[in-house]
């Protein structure tokens, strides 16, 4: 899956840390494996700082790590749970059933 993100303001964010409002580019890859906290600690121990962490009311969440100097982009580590799996099942369903009419689909 490719996720396209557009930030419609200049507020500070993990995306604005890398690109200003007139710039665009490849921001991050997302990884969904193992225990989130353990994986973040492993990356931190390797010298990659946690930049942003969040968790939604539904229990979805992630941590962005600063891996730009090493690999050219940030790395996102997901919290893997039923809510995340359901979200991506909905994304897949929307893609498979897309009628070609709307470029933006609200899920």
Q: Can you say where each PLM-predicted feature lies in the sequence?
A:
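A short beta-turn/loop motif at secondary-structure boundaries
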Residues: 55-57
């Amino acid at each position: 899956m490719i996720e396209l993100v557009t930030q419609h303001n200049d507020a500070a964010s993990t995306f604005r840390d890398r690109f200003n409002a007139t710039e665009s580019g490849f921001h991050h890859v997302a990884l969904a494996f193992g225990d989130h906290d353990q994986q973040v600690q492993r990356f931190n121990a390797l010298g990659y700082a946690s930049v942003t962490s969040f968790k939604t009311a539904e229990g979805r969440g992630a941590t962005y790590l600063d891996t730009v100097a090493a690999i050219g982009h940030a790395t996102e580590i997901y919290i893997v749970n039923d809510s995340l799996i359901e979200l991506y099942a909905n994304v897949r369903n929307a893609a498979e059933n897309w009628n070609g009419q709307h470029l933006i689909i609200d899920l």
